[in-house]
Structures are given as structure tokens and as C-alpha cells.
Amino acid sequence: MDYDNMVKTLEILKDVVNALECADKGNFDKALEYLEKAQKVDKDNPLVLYVKGIVLKLKGDMEKAEKYFECLENIEGTSLLSLGNLICLTFVKGEYERTLKYIEKLSRLSKPCYLSPFHKALIYIEFGEFEKALEALDEFLKIYPNLTSILRQKASILEILGKLDEALDCVNKILSIKKDDAHAWYLKGRILKKLGNIKEALDALKMAINLNENLVHVYKDIAYLELANNNYEEALNYITKYLEKFPNDVEAKFYLALIYENLNKVDDALKIYDKIISNKNVKDKLLIKSSILNKARILEKLGKIEEAVETYNKAFDNNI
């Protein structure tokens, strides 16, 4: 390198260092000024282009950041650093086909890079292509076999696909790595519920809520299972806690009415069924018809036959 080129390189490095210092302190505009100064010396300098892309990304200007990473990719032919950033940027923008194109290129060049299988899995989940998502997650797990967040994602997909035994094995692996993972316990309870293992499902769901009391939605699952298990007082306790947080959940109110029925609090049950039936915002026709039929059954038991028959007839109204 001759003297002039050496001076030019040092000037560029000085501007890049200054830009990095400014960017590190959040002064992105000043950082960009230094980088533009460096570009006047060498417009297509790869280091300047890369740092400029990073600064623009941090500043939130995704379009311009992407432009510089693409420019660097074109100049260099192959830039792994640019590919990694292009994957993230196009994914955030929802341009999944482009993301997959960059993923394919990066995965050929750097197999251990987690970005490729991770984003690929998320895209296939978005597309509803769950088998392909599983393949991508398995690629990821070859690199990091004990990463519980990825194992959880895999277990959830297996559950969606109805592969419940495999999903349960996956959750059990998570719990062998991290026994206090509240979401994994919730997932286990949900899967066991689908497998018909009520007692084990309840144990798992209660463990989840003990580990993280903010998982309020779990109260509803527990209430449903306690109801199915004829533990009505327990069911009442959990559904009440749930409805304190989500008072407008109509399905949960329906469970509450069923619980009241089984506790012989028929007046309370009837009030809830009437509210569900008269609620114009309820779109679930099955829930409305079930409420009408349950109301009719109660009226029949109370000896109010004429009112019961009238209510039964409403259940067969096609306008419901």
C-alpha cells in the first residue's frame, strides 16, 4: 500500500471509529455525518457501508438500512454479516419470500448460524406449514439441543398437529432442563387434558399457576377440569378467580352456570343462562343453544313445564 492509500485508509478508519462512538451513545445523526464523510473518500468501502447499515437500523430507518446491506452484498458477492441483517430486516417487514431467499444463501455458507432455521421456522408457522416449521426447528435443535424456548415452540406445533405423545415427550424434556418453567407446565397440562389424563393435567396446570400467578388464563382450564371431575367447589374457586380478571368471557360464565347447577344454586345458574341468551354480542350459536337447553332442563326439573317447553322450542329456532 502506497503512502496516499494508507492515509486515505486511516482517515476512513478514524471516521468509522468516531461514528461507532457516536452511535454507541445514541447520537445516530452525528454518526451518519462521519460515515458520509468517509464515503466521500471511498464511496463503496465495505466497512463504511456495513456500519452505516447498522446505524440506520438502530435509528429505525429500515428501508435505508436494507439498501446499504444489499449494496454491500452486491459489492462483496457474499457478505455473511449483510445476509444476517437482511434476514432480520425483511422478516420484520413481513417480506417472507425474500427472507427465505437470504436464509437459503446464509445456510449454505454458515450452517451453525441460528438465524436461518429460527426465522425459517417462524415464517413456516406464519404460513401454516407446520411440518416444514418442525423441520426448521429440528435444524435449530441440532445446533442448540437444550434451548427450552425452541423446544416449547416445537411442542406447541406437535400439539397443533395432534402428535400429542411426541408433544408430551418434548415438554418433559423442557422440564428435565428447567423444572420451574411455568409455560412448559401449562403446555403439559393442556396436552394431558387432550389425552384424557385429567388428574395429571390438573397437577400440571396447578404447578404452572403456582410458578407464575400471572398466567390467569390457566384458572379457566383448571376450572373446566375440576368441573369435569365433579369437584364443584374447586371449580367455583378457580372460575371466580378467572372471571375477576376477564369478566366478559361468556364461555367462562357458561362454566360458572354449570357449576351453580351442580351445586343446586339453580337461581344463580338461570340468571347467567338468561344473560348469555339475551346478549346480542355472543356469536357462538352453540353456546347460546346450550344455554337455552340447560335453562329448559332446569325449568323442567322445577316443574315449570309450560315455560320449559317454550324454552326448548327456542333452541330449535333457526334464527339463533
From Swiss-Prot:
Gene3D superfamilies: Tetratricopeptide repeat domain
Pfam families xref list: TPR_16 (PF13432), TPR_19 (PF14559), TPR_8 (PF13181)
Origin: domain of life: Archaea
UniProt TPR repeat ranges: 12-45, 46-79, 80-113, 114-147, 148-181, 182-215, 216-249, 250-283, 289-320
Record keyword Endoplasmic reticulum present: no
Keyword Glycoprotein attached: no
Keywords of the record: Repeat, TPR repeat
Protein name: TPR repeat-containing protein MJ0263
Organism, as annotated: Methanocaldococcus jannaschii (strain ATCC 43067 / DSM 2661 / JAL-1 / JCM 10045 / NBRC 100440)
